[in-house]
Amino acid sequence: MANQFHEANRRRWDAASASWAHHADTRGIWKRCHLDASLALDAAELNWLRDVGGKSIAVLGSGDNQVAFALSGMGAKVTSIDISEQQLDVARRRAAALGLNVKFVQADVVDLSSLGNATFDLVYTGGYVAPWVSDLTRYYGEAARILKPDGLLIVSEYHPFRRVWSRSASDLKVGINYFDRGPHRFEAAMDVLYHAPGELEQFEFHWTVADYITAILASGCQLIHAEEFGDTSEEWEGAPMSGLPVSLLLIGRREE
């Protein structure tokens, strides 16, 4: 049975794919990140991705596919997985234009049954994927299942501390309880970056730091590294968050 929250989010991303593609075209990172991986991956992430040439890597919730393109440019054999077929269609066209050999698979990250057990040397997921997913344990459980023994699960997510603030250009004030995991229902506009109301239904989930750690451990991976990085603030975030960590990086190793 299809997950109603994920189906709503799939429809939302299918509908918004053209708008999101326009933003990506304006920034132009997708055109260059296969030549310079640091455009798509932070130094903290690249520390764990130094020697990926020839390795099989799955990117879960690949979205704009900048990470997938960066890893492909580094010589990895990349499989890009996303719930939105429209997002993947955009990525296919871009990969062809860049001459990149990336495999694209449409799937929900909590059901990767189209992918075999112990298939990949490394699984990367992050950016802003987990807030769209209703079951973190199944999500990371599937990620671990497709990992080869001793393979790495790299989770690099938007930091949960940044999700609690009210929208204000000048003040930091808690607007959402840190422990209110949701589902949070929104009627959103076509433009993903801006918070105007619209006709597209979407659901988000606010996972805590402990939720991320617990889900990785439950997946059968050993947690071998944890790190927070970034301290800037972006206009789309709607609050002055400079000085707070931007991202949470967790590294798991699939146990034998």
Which residue ranges define each predicted feature?
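Short alpha-helix
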Residues: 203-226
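Conserved class I S-adenosyl-L-methionine
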Residues: 152-189
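A short SAM/SAH-binding and catalytic strip from SAM-dependent methyltransferases
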Residues: 121-137
